[in-house]
């Protein structure tokens, strides 16, 4: 036997939510009263209001800096449109469970992106509750619970000093602006020969010893700290301290620099040799050949004493060097005995006179042609 079908009005009532139309709904307010939120209507709800109200709010990240102040920030650019989100906070199950509004907002491009809490508002060992809310959509909110002792970031260590304990041992000391027993430290050091750092963990003591050092090397040290493990379980380290150096400034050269210098010297030497060879061949082509004593006699014999033939001097230059006069030989003899005549005869030439000195040659000009 067939069951009677549902009335048409019942089917329509069941399909109304699927068609996106509203019904008369009520919700309970915190004081227990009923609050009517919508009346029965047969129109479609705006899709943009649905999408905005269902979008998740950005996550809030809080960090306590050296227990002096705390910043809670969020990514304001993740919103579909610029929105000044508001932040409320309180401490769970404590005397400070009263809801507080943020009194000091941080801004990014004139949009709220964080909140800063001062030292008096920070209670490390109480559960911190933070609530982010969209003021345009009060029901759009997100709540997080945080343990602040795990979110502490100390300041970087300060006043690094080095002491030489012995001929080959160094001790590094530093200071922190927080209780030393709450911090652990990480020391890094390297020499000017090293390409990477060597790390060494140090407990709450603020000193580190290096048992063996090389006086010919230059050492660099730096330190950072973390709020762990006695007072909290923070995972974030502080910034690195300013580095401190020890050792000779004239240490051995870096192997890489030594290899680079060797290559530069080799290439420079080869370039110099090639340049000298080029200059030598150029001079050999442009300068006249100068014979050695061994083959000078052979050259004179081969070229019949013609210097210009084998020296490379041009014919025009050789002709211009020819003299334009002729020489007459002058005979010089020894001084005659006393009483002898100075001349051999009445027509004797001065060139034939006897003189204790060398007589210059006599010249006669060639007749002009």
UniProtKB/Swiss-Prot annotation:
Residues 156-253 form the Fibronectin type-III domain. SUPFAM superfamilies: Fibronectin type III (SSF49265). The keyword DNA-binding does not apply. The keyword Signal applies. One of its GO terms (cellular component) is external side of plasma membrane. Residues 23-262 are extracellular. InterPro entries: CRLF2-like_D2 (IPR048648), FN3_dom (IPR003961), FN3_sf (IPR036116), Hempt_rcpt_S_F1_CS (IPR003531), Ig-like_fold (IPR013783), TSLPR_D1 (IPR053856). A motif (WSXWS motif) lies at residues 237-241. The chain crosses the membrane at residues 263-283. Keywords: Cell membrane, Disease variant, Disulfide bond, Glycoprotein, Host-virus interaction, Membrane, Phosphoprotein, Receptor, SCID, Signal, Transmembrane, Transmembrane helix. GO terms for molecular function: coreceptor activity; cytokine binding; cytokine receptor activity; interleukin-15 receptor activity; interleukin-2 binding. It is a single-pass type I membrane protein. A motif (Box 1 motif) lies at residues 286-294. Glycans are attached at residues 24, 71, 75, 84, 159, 249. GO terms for biological process: CD4-positive, CD25-positive, alpha-beta regulatory T cell differentiation; cellular homeostasis; cytokine-mediated signaling pathway; gene expression; immune response; interleukin-15-mediated signaling pathway; interleukin-2-mediated signaling pathway; interleukin-4-mediated signaling pathway. It is linked to Severe combined immunodeficiency X-linked T-cell-negative/B-cell-positive/NK-cell-negative: A form of severe combined immunodeficiency (SCID), a genetically and clinically heterogeneous group of rare congenital disorders characterized by impairment of both humoral and cell-mediated immunity, leukopenia, and low or absent antibody levels. Patients present in infancy recurrent, persistent infections by opportunistic organisms. The common characteristic of all types of SCID is absence of T-cell-mediated cellular immunity due to a defect in T-cell development. This is Cytokine receptor common subunit gamma.
């Amino acid at each position: 036997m067939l069951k009677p079908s549902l009335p048409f009005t019942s089917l329509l009532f069941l399909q109304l939510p699927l068609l996106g139309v509203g019904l008369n709904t009520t919700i309970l307010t915190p004081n227990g009263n009923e609050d009517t939120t919508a009346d029965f209507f047969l129109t479609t709800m705006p899709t943009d209001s649905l999408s905005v109200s269902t979008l998740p709010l950005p996550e809030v990240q809080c960090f306590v800096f050296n227990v002096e102040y705390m910043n809670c920030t969020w990514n304001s650019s993740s919103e579909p449109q610029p929105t000044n989100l508001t932040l409320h906070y309180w401490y769970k199950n404590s005397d400070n469970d009263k809801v507080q509004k943020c009194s000091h907002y941080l801004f990014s491009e004139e949009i709220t992106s964080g909140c800063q809490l001062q030292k008096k508002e920070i209670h490390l060992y109480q559960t911190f509750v933070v609530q982010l809310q969209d003021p345009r959509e009060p029901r759009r909110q997100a709540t997080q619970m945080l343990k602040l002792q795990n979110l502490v970031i100390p300041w970087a260590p300060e006043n690094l000093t080095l002491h030489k304990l012995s001929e080959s041992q160094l001790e590094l000391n530093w200071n922190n602006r927080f209780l030393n027993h709450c911090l652990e430290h990480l020391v890094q050091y390297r020499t000017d020969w090293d390409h990477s750092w060597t790390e060494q963990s140090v407990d709450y003591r603020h000193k580190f010893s290096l048992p063996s050092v090389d006086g010919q090397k230059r050492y660099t040290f730096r330190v950072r700290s973390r709020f762990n493990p006695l007072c909290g379980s923070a995972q974030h380290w502080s910034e690195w301290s300013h580095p401190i150096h020890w050792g000779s400034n004239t240490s051995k050269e870096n192997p890489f620099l030594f290899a680079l210098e060797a290559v530069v010297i080799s290439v420079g030497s080869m370039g110099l040799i090639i340049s000298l060879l080029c200059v030598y061949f150029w001079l050999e082509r442009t300068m006249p050949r100068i014979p050695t004593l061994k083959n000078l006699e052979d050259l004179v014999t081969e070229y019949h004493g013609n210097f210009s033939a084998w020296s490379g001097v041009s014919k025009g230059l050789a002709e211009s060097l020819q003299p334009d006069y002729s020489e007459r030989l002058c005979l010089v003899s020894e001084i005659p005995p006393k009483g002898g005549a100075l001349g051999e005869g009445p027509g004797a030439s001065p060139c034939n006179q006897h003189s204790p000195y060398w007589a210059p040659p006599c010249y006669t000009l060639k007749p002009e042609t």
